[in-house]
Amino acid sequence: MRCIHELADVFINDSDERILTQSLDATEIDKHADYESFFSINSDESIMKARPWKSNAKYFKKTYISSLALCKMSVHAKSGGAIEVMGMMTGKIIKNSIIVMDVYPLPVEGTETRVNAQAEGYEYMVQYLENSKQVGRDENIVGWYHSHPGYGCWLSGIDVATQSLNQNFQDPYLAIVIDPMKTEDQGKVEIGAFRTFPDNYKSPDSAAPTNNTRGVPPSKQKDFGVHSDKYYSLDIQIFKSNLDTEILNIISNKSWIGKLIKSVNTANHQEQNMIENVFKLINKLQKKEVNQLNRFEISFIKKFDLIFEDIISKKLMNDNRFYSTISQSSYDSFSGHGNSSSNDEMDDESDLDDRDKSSAPLDISDTGNDDVMSMESSVNVYTDKRGDDNDDDDDNDGYDKRPMYTNYRSRANLTKPRKSGSSPEEHVKLSNNVNKTITNISNHSKDIGLTELQDLIALKTKESIFLGK
């Protein structure tokens, strides 16, 4: 609602130079004046009977316009764009003044330079007044308003004829003109209030017609200033109630430029904050240390990385074959070529003698108590050679402890789940350790700004361990 910038208190004194339009600044209303009485008083009956405007052509010197009426006129004029619009005004008559309490638009045909009220417009006017009386609104019609989009507030020849006709039959009558385009450009309501003189009346302070027709449409230039001696302008005073003040504070566009600047500054500030947060996150990632994790968690992460490496390699190479080697020391320990003490130590650390050796998955259950497993030893796996009649190892019947140089699809796929010979309590402990570790890794990942990818890989790692996937 940019056309409603401010409602203001502007007094225009009589002078030799005719001032036909006013730019109203709207929140500067005279706070000391008692305008609340305008809502409760009725028209002055003594003035209505005496009709002093018949003997004094300039009896009415001021018009009071409510903030509601000004808003409605401005919005209506703005909605018409380059097309003229028209409406009626209702109000009251007091000494030397016309009070405009409310306005309503008329369904009329408008062009860029003219507006004509047809029969349906007059019918609408009568019905509106009847309905207003039924709801307790006793105001009568006190005038009409129309718009001049882009070419100022003044009365053309047709406007003068229309206003003179209405003043003869239903005086007091007022004409108001609003320029919505200038209102939008300057941020203040461009408005003028006028009354015409009687026929053959010569105003003593009438000004000569002006030749400045800038912005006036060609069809209106011949009328511009020609009829200026047939009407005069009234001072305009805006008034509002206490309740109107709160509403105007909401819809007022007094600081619309400031709001635009503020919105731009806010966007720039948000962008700067985002960039600063990115750099802070990078610094945090660079300085983050993993020494906060215990040995079990570090070992878990290493195994985690191995499985993730296999998955990514499979995706990149699009090949089911993956080659793996182990060190000679691991070969000796698994093939029995190393010393027995090494084998015994290996068995003690992994508790292989206490479990059924039908498979050997990636073991994370022992790493919570042992030292961190090396990357080399963590890739040792067993191959299932059941049914091999030539196997001489009675203690490990059906298995061949040899380093894997054979092709396989994935380490995780070759590691079958062990048939745990341990108690249910140990299995629960293993599960709890895994869940706790995954939770710690997830929290740690969030601390250093990682995405949900690591949580997903952790879940896949857990499935690989317990399901042998």
Swiss-Prot record:
Top-level taxon in the UniProt lineage: Eukaryota
Cross-referenced InterPro entries: JAMM/MPN+_dom, JAMM_MPN+_peptidase_M67A, MPN
UniProt KW Amino-acid biosynthesis keyword: no
GO molecular function: metal ion binding; metallopeptidase activity
Keywords: Cytoplasm, Hydrolase, Metal-binding, Metalloprotease, Nucleus, Protease, Signalosome, Zinc
One matching Pfam family: JAB
Segments forming domain MPN: 63-200
GO biological process: proteolysis
Function: Catalytic Component of the COP9 signalosome (CSN) complex that acts as an regulator of the ubiquitin (Ubl) conjugation pathway by mediating the deneddylation of the cullin subunit of SCF-type E3 ubiquitin-protein ligase complexes. The CSN complex is involved in the regulation of the mating pheromone response.
Similarity remark: Belongs to the peptidase M67A family. CSN5 subfamily.
Subunit-level organization: Component of the COP9 signalosome (CSN) complex.
Domain notes: The JAMM motif is essential for the protease activity of the CSN complex resulting in deneddylation of cullins. It constitutes the catalytic center of the complex.
Name of protein: COP9 signalosome complex subunit 5
Organism, as annotated: Debaryomyces hansenii (strain ATCC 36239 / CBS 767 / BCRC 21394 / JCM 1990 / NBRC 0083 / IGC 2968)
The gene coding this protein: RRI1
